[in-house]
Amino acid sequence: MLKREMNIADYDTELWQAMQQEVTRQEQHIELIASENYTSPRVMQAQGSQLTNKYAEGYPGKRYYGGCQYVDQVEQLAIDRAKALFGADYANVQPHSGSQANFAVYTALLQPGDTVLGMNLAHGGHLTHGSPVNFSGKLYNVVPYGIDAHGRIDYDDLAAQAQRHRPKMIIGGFSAYSGVVDWARMREIANSIGAYLFVDMAHVAGLVAAGVYPNPIPHAHVVTTTTHKTLAGPRGGLILAKGLDETMYKKLNSAVFPGAQGGPLMHVIAAKAVALKEAMEPEFTRYQQQVAKNAKAMVDVFLQRGYKVVSGGTENHLFLLDLVDRQITGKEADAALGHANITVNKNSVPNDPQSPFVTSGIRIGTPAITRRGFKEAESRELAGWMCDVLDNIHDEATIACTKQKVLALCERLPVYA
C-alpha cells in the first residue's frame, strides 16, 4: 500500500535540493527566453495526478486497454476545447511535444524524399522545418526560404522558389521571427502548385487564441502547436485542422498512434485540457495583449539605446537583437546577462558570421515576465538594465548592481504569490 504522505524531500534529499534550487532560480531570475513560460498551479495539479498511472493506447472510444472510460472523458474535453479555442474541426491532443506533432504531420502528408519548403533556421525557422541535423532535413528534400533585407518574409522569393522546386508541402511558422505572417498569401502560393500548407504556430498559439495574432487555421491544411510557450500550458503538442475529409483526419491520427507514439500521457492531456479552458477566459486575452505591449516597450528602449533589432521591431511576443555591430557574441551576451539574473538565449541572426554555438544575437521574449505581472514600465526598465550590462559587458560592478535591481523586482513580482 502506498501512503499519500510519501514525499521526495524525506526520501531523496539530493534530488529535492536540485528541484528546490530550480524553484529559487525561477523566482529570482527574470525569464526572457521566448519559448518559456510559467504554467498555473491547476495545470501542475493535473500533471501530478493519478492519471499518470493509466495506459490508454488508442483514442476515446477506441482503446486497446480496458478501464479507459474516465480518461476518455478527459481526452475528449481536451479535444473539444482545442477545437473550440482555435476554430478547428479536428484536434489531436496526444503528441508529447511540438516536434512529435510535426513528425506526425510529415509522415501523414509526405513520403521520404519529397520536397518541402521551410524557413531557414538562421532566418528564424525551427529545427523541424528542415534543419539537416533533424529528421526533417534527413528524410526530406528541404529547400529553405528566408527573410529580406528588412527582416520580413520575402513572399515573392517564396513564390518563385515554389514554382522552381514544386514542393509537396510548404511550412509556415517560426521560432525567431518577430513579424506577422501572411497566412493567406502562403496558402495562395501553396495552391498555385498544388502543395499542402502546414503551419507550426507553436510560438504564437496563445496570441492566436486571444485574437492578438492572425489565426492560421482558416488558411492552412494542417496546423501544429506546442501547449507551453505563449499558451502557458504543460509541455506537449497539438495537431489541428479544419475543412479536410475524414480520411485525412484518420491519417493524421494514425501518424501519431501507432505511427510515432504508443500510449498517450493522460496526466499531461488533462493538464492540456485545463490550460485550454484557462485560455478561454477574458483574463487570458488581457494577458496576451500585455505580452505584445511589453515586447514593443522593450524594443523601443533597445532602439533608443542604439541597438539593432532584426526587422526593426516586433508584432508578436519576441524579437532578436543583432549584436554584430557591437562586436559582442550571443554567447557573451547570454553569459553576462545571466550573471545579472536575466535569462535569455543566444540566437543566430541573418548572415551571422558566428557558428550556431556562438551566434551574434540574442532572442528576447515577454510571455514569462508578463505572466509574473510586468507591464510596460517594468519592461522598459528591464530593457534599460540589459543595455547597461551589454554596454559594459566586462564590468563586474555594473553586472552586480543590475543583479540587485533584478532581485528587488523579482521579490516585488513573484511568479507564484
Swiss-Prot record:
Q: Which reaction does it catalyse?
A: (6R)-5,10-methylene-5,6,7,8-tetrahydrofolate + glycine + H2O = (6S)-5,6,7,8-tetrahydrofolate + L-serine
> Quick one: which residues bind (6S)-5,6,7,8-tetrahydrofolate?
L121, G125, H126, L127, S355, P356, F357
GO MF term set: glycine hydroxymethyltransferase activity; pyridoxal phosphate binding
**InterPro entries linked to this entry:** PyrdxlP-dep_Trfase, PyrdxlP-dep_Trfase_major, PyrdxlP-dep_Trfase_small, Ser_HO-MeTrfase, Ser_HO-MeTrfase-like, Ser_HO-MeTrfase_PLP_BS, SHMT-like_dom
Positions carrying N6-(pyridoxal phosphate)lysine:
K229
Q: So which cofactors does this thing need?
A: pyridoxal 5'-phosphate
What biological process terms from GO does the record include? glycine biosynthetic process from serine; tetrahydrofolate interconversion
* NCBIfam families to which the protein is assigned, alphabetical: PRK00011.1
Q: How does it assemble?
A: Homodimer.
Name of the molecule in the record: Serine hydroxymethyltransferase
Q: Per UniProt, what is the name of the gene that codes for the protein in this document? A: glyA
